[in-house]
């Protein structure tokens, strides 16, 4: 893994670690924010609020371990793909939320 790739994995891993920790610590606040934005159907708010944090933490740990050279390349790439998909979903969510304002 190149230095730039490792640094990127570590940086994204740290962002996901912070975000995931906050979402796990306060799923009610996450659910309330989802409700306030009004983008997703109400029945999905609770499940998403409970799942988002753990998913972010798993991706964070895999990226941090991969960036530090403690994880094989394939699982690190899978985690990177998961982070990209999460980022794309978040971007789409933000665009929809902005359209509502």
What do the predicted segments below correspond to?
Residues 1-101:
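Membrane-interfacial helix-loop segments of redox and metal-homeostasis proteins
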């Amino acid at each position: 893994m190149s230095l730039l790739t490792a640094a990127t994995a570590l940086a994204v891993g740290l962002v996901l670690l912070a975000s995931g920790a906050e979402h796990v610590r306060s799923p009610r606040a996450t659910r309330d924010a989802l409700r306030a934005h009004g983008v997703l159907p109400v029945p999905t708010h609770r499940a998403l609020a409970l799942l988002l944090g753990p998913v972010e933490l798993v991706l964070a740990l895999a990226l941090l371990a991969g960036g530090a050279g403690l994880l094989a390349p394939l699982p690190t790439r899978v985690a990177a793909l998961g982070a990209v998909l999460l980022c794309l979903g978040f971007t789409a969510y933000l665009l929809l939320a902005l359209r509502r304002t």
